[in-house]
Amino acid sequence: MNDRTEAVKAYLLDLQDRICAALEVEDGGARFVEDAWTRPGGGGGRTRVIENGALIEKGGVNFSHVHGDSLPPSASAHRPELAGRSFEALGVSLVIHPHNPYVPTSHANVRFFIAEKDGEEPVWWFGGGFDLTPYYGAEEDCVHWHRVARDACAPFGAEVYPRYKEWCDRYFHIKHRNEPRGVGGLFFDDLNQWDFDTSFAFMRAVGDAYLQAYLPIVQRRKATPFGERERQFQLLRRGRYVEYNLVYDRGTLFGLQSGGRTESILMSLPPQVAWGYDKRPEPGSPEARLTEYFLQDRDWLAAAPA
């Protein structure tokens, strides 16, 4: 492992520690349980799961560092020149499923790939982002989430936030439902057009922004009263989350195809979920407003104060 990979690994381990500590404080009840694991094909990781807390029904913050002799199809399909290269993949990936339907589900991921072949220059890239999936949307929350995303991108150029915001909208789209998974945020992949230090700094900016984006929303919503109606709608909407993750998510597919640890890969799935045949919210209801207003490709900062 070279110095660059060591630096990325040290940052990711620290990021996992910081996020887990902050979420434990916010929950106030449950604590993360760590499961350190090794991958037979090379590498390993630290899976941390929190369940049945005062705030978090289920959450996972996973660090992994895996390596192998060749990239799986999910990673090389759009970069065929990488076929046959050995690889190292490091990342932190997290999903938080709160119990209260008024607190959105959040997802974040930052990762680094390096692919090598004897006699050729290494090929490396960064990826990551964060996105928000509300069940009962609040415009204030969407604006805050996107403002933090914009501010994280700002030192790297005015064009960066719009580019990765739009990519997030496209990436987290449930094609068979023709609807977004949530209200978006940032998504980037194959980032190597800058030099290594700048690219690494951008990944850190995104990783560090997650708590700044999510915790104020949690603090605003976690005491909101709810009943069985809201809970059942949350479970139905979680079904969309499961559909997306198992059918489209590149990280999930990469993990499964590369012989990754199934329990860690599938930690993103909610603990309870429901499907109903052709369930549609009542017109004019708060539930209908989710899809009619919030689950649209929208510039949340257009009308918001700077």
From Swiss-Prot:
Q: Where in the cell is it found?
A: Cytoplasm
Q: Where is the active site?
A: H107 (proton donor)
Q: Where does a divalent metal cation bind?
A: H97, H107, H146, H176
Q: What class of enzyme is it?
A: oxidoreductase
Give the GO cellular component terms, alphabetically.
Answer: cytoplasm
Quote the pathway field. Answer: Porphyrin-containing compound metabolism; protoporphyrin-IX biosynthesis; protoporphyrinogen-IX from coproporphyrinogen-III (O2 route): step 1/1
List the molecular function annotations (GO) for this entry.
coproporphyrinogen oxidase activity; metal ion binding; protein homodimerization activity
Enzyme Commission no: 1.3.3.3
Q: Name one Pfam family in it.
A: Coprogen_oxidas
Q: Where is this region: Important for dimerization?
A: 241-276
Name the source's superkingdom.
Bacteria
- Similarity comment: family membership: Belongs to the aerobic coproporphyrinogen-III oxidase family.
- The molecule here is called Oxygen-dependent coproporphyrinogen-III oxidase
Species of the source: Stutzerimonas stutzeri (strain A1501) (Pseudomonas stutzeri)
Which gene is the coding source of this polypeptide chain?
hemF
